[in-house]
Amino acid sequence: MLRRMRIPAEPKVIIRHCDAYDPARIRTLVREGLEELGLRPHGRTLIKPNLVAAGPLFPHAYTRPEFMEGVVRALQDRATDSLREIAVGE
């Protein structure tokens, strides 16, 4: 059965400040945002990060692994029992 994401009547943007790339802190902030929006991942879920930064590991822009860890763990925290897969598309 295909379930589509519920689109809110009034779109909402949540912006949070995070001082460091701490996966635990990122997890908390993202989980709180998901809760505020009433979103619960289910089925096969794809995330496509657009947050990038340059650093010593790669001189060009890339998405930090600590950020992705926090986001994926927050999605797992909020997931329904029907969540089968979380995929990352870059």
Pin down the residues of each PLM region.
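N-terminal and secondary-structure boundary signal
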Residues: 1-90
